[in-house]
Amino acid sequence: MTDIDSSRRKFLISSAAGISGLVIAQSSLAGTVTNLLDPGSPLMLPENFSPSVWFTMQSSGETTIHVFRQELGQHIGTAFAQIIAEELELDWSKVSIDYPSVDAAIVAETGVQLTGGSASVLQSFDPLSRAAAVARQFLIDSGADILGSEPSDCYAENSYVIDPIFDQRISYGQILAQTVIDHKIQPEELAEVQLKRRPDYKIIGQPAHALDIEEKVNGKARYGIDARVPNMVFGKASLAPTRLGSTI
């Protein structure tokens, strides 16, 4: 199978400087680079790898999953990553997670930013799956264009778009180095996208190394009890020493 070299350029405008990323569920701010074809008219490109609501993909091939729930030791971050990696057909070795701070824009997009009732995976499975599936199709469309193939002839696997007819493939990283995919997913796209069948799952249901296990073991992970603010004081409830003790 032929790997397409990342120096190939079929998207002239969006290939400038080779900085690009796939931002899902949130339009990014725009940065400027010089338009070499018309120096007086700068090209508008998304900021390099601006965080999105659900995940951010980079031309390095890395994907960061943004977990907008509180981690209490139940490994919801790894679960979210597995859900997205499954539909997006990611190379699991290049997936990481982070836990963004509470933000009004994020709450407006997701509707809620809390954890409770053991409902994180239950409530997030479908929206995460659909966002990843739509993104996969974006990548297939762009990858097929670079390969000179028909999108319907291509499929995604292990962070590659593959054309089995002409025996060639291109990695997600190479695609993002050659073009900018700056499209805000629309509700109708989420509703209509075709999700994978359970028998086709490769990541969900399989043993997986917790992506944040090192931080939890070495003490680097920060929990609510670790929070500190200026002039913070500590308090303790004063209780009667016996169950039926007098009110204090």
Placement of each model-derived feature along the sequence:
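Cofactor-binding beta-sheet edge motifs in enzyme active sites
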Residues: T2-I24, G31-I248
